[in-house]
Amino acid sequence: MMRFMFLVASLLLCAAAFGAEPVVQLNSATVAPREIEDNTEKAVVRDYTRAWQSLAIALSENNSAALANDFVGQAQDELQQRVSAQQKSGLHTRYIDHGHNVQAVFYSQDGSAMQLRDTARLEVQMLDGDKVIHSDQFTQNYLVVMTAGDARWKVRVLQALPAK
């Protein structure tokens, strides 16, 4: 029985680290020059959530193909380079996502692009095989540009901002 309880607890911890959706809260009250439609706001939250899940999978499994559906342009290029560097070093990164407070800053007149500011609470673990060699919990601010395309929003820019 104890062995079974340990297995269940281990599975729950893994699900929390890898499978759980990050919580993304979007505030669009001050966006300019136009308001965000309700359906668009829901789509942005859904797709930004998926992007963070894809990022976590790509860096955990050292698999840049996981980025293809959610990232384009600069963000995709930079993350692919990071995956490549990890592959060369033999390390991988585990993201444990504790949520995102996202502020919509700009929504283009034609509805094709949106700028966001994200305050993300993250735990990042560097692993060599199964061994954690470094772990850090922090809050990171990001400048994000998302563009519409193929019936979904994709992250074009994901730039970490320096601490104030």
Briefly describe each language-model feature range.
Residues 111-164:
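Exposed beta-sheet edge and beta->alpha loop/turn motif
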Residues 19-73:
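Short, low-complexity N-terminal intrinsically disordered segments enriched in polar/charged residues
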Residues 52, 75, 122-124:
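Residue-level detector of secondary-structure transition/capping positions
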Residues 50, 98, 137-139:
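Short solvent-exposed loop/turn micro-motifs enriched in small/polar/acidic residues
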Residues 14-15:
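N-terminal signal peptide c-region/cleavage motif recognized by signal peptidases
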Residues 1-5:
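Positively charged n-region of N-terminal signal peptides that target proteins for export
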Residues 35-39, 64-109:
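Short solvent-exposed beta->alpha transition segments
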